[in-house]
Curated annotation (Swiss-Prot):
SUPFAM superfamilies: RNA polymerase subunit RPB10 (SSF46924). Keywords: Cytoplasm, DNA-directed RNA polymerase, Metal-binding, Nucleotidyltransferase, Transcription, Transferase, Zinc. The keyword Isomerase does not apply. GO terms for biological process: DNA-templated transcription. Belongs to the archaeal Rpo10/eukaryotic RPB10 RNA polymerase subunit family. GO terms for molecular function: DNA binding; DNA-directed RNA polymerase activity; zinc ion binding. This is DNA-directed RNA polymerase subunit Rpo10. It catalyses: RNA(n) + a ribonucleoside 5'-triphosphate = RNA(n+1) + diphosphate. Pfam families: RNA_pol_N. Binds 1 zinc ion. Part of the RNA polymerase complex.
């Protein structure tokens, strides 16, 4: 669905970095690891939240 506001494991705020990460790493040609380093997302649990997230709102919305 939508990116969670906080990391499930440590509670650190990750939602504020999602838009920039999506623009630079997913739609651009930059390395996701370098983008996360520049954004200050350094914990492996928070990085997992950003890298593994898939936006499924458009897929699920027709069924509601």
């Amino acid at each position: 669905m939508m990116i969670p506001v906080r990391c499930f494991t440590c509670g650190n705020v990750v939602g504020e970095h999602w838009e920039e990460f999506k623009e630079r790493a997913r739609e651009g040609d930059e390395d996701p690891g370098k983008v996360l380093d520049e954004l200050g997302v350094d914990r492996h649990c928070c990085r997992r939240m950003m890298v593994s997230h898939r936006d499924l709102v458009d897929v699920v919305s027709p069924y509601q």
